[in-house]
A protein has these predicted regions:
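Structured interface patches
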Residues: 1-174
Length: 174
């Protein structure tokens, strides 16, 4: 069952039951997702179970629905130079076409066997809903930095003693 403005609690599935299948129809809403677990790249990760406010626009097109999703997410990381914790809010955008599955004259789903399309990945409308999890994961992974910095001019730590090089002069006896 899909509730709360078209979104299933605890998932990224959005119901399309309120959107007529006629091309040109549109549905817009403000939603809130919960960040999926274990979403990280290098030294940065999405804060586990954090709220992800989003604005969604779903447009009915001839072969499916076009989804435009803008969302914010909280990032937790360590500076790649000084290893201090760093947190910020990032923004991402997803635009994805979800196709309707082909059906026969009785409304049963037809399984297409096209060897040429094996390399392509399509997203499909399933049970009058779209699942945005894979698209959101892809967008976040592309947005997270591999080597986050607390500041662009961070000096890092001393390679000999491990102290931060910020602030007071730093010297070692030779």
């Amino acid at each position: 069952m899909i509730v709360r403005g078209g979104i299933e609690p605890g998932s990224f599935r959005v119901s399309l039951t309120h959107l007529p299948r006629r091309p040109g129809n549109m549905w817009e809403a403000d939603l809130e997702f919960v960040a999926p677990p274990e979403l990280e790249v290098g030294m940065a990760k999405v804060a586990p179970a954090s709220k992800m406010p989003a604005q969604i626009r779903i447009e009915s097109v001839l072969d499916g629905v076009l989804v435009n999703l803008d969302f914010d997410f909280e990032v937790e990381a360590e500076c790649a130079r000084c290893l201090e914790p760093v947190m910020w809010t990032d923004h991402s955008r997803v635009t994805e076409l979800f196709l309707y599955e082909e059906t026969d004259s009785r409304g049963r789903v037809v399984q297409a066997c096209d060897d040429a399309s094996e390399e392509l990945t399509f997203f499909y409308v399933q049970d009058d809903a779209v699942d945005l999890l894979d698209s959101v994961r892809d967008a976040i992974v592309l947005d997270l930095p591999l080597s986050p910095l607390c500041r662009p001019d961070c000096l890092g730590i001393c390679p000999q003693c491990g102290d931060k090089l910020e602030g007071a002069p730093h010297e070692h006896a030779t």
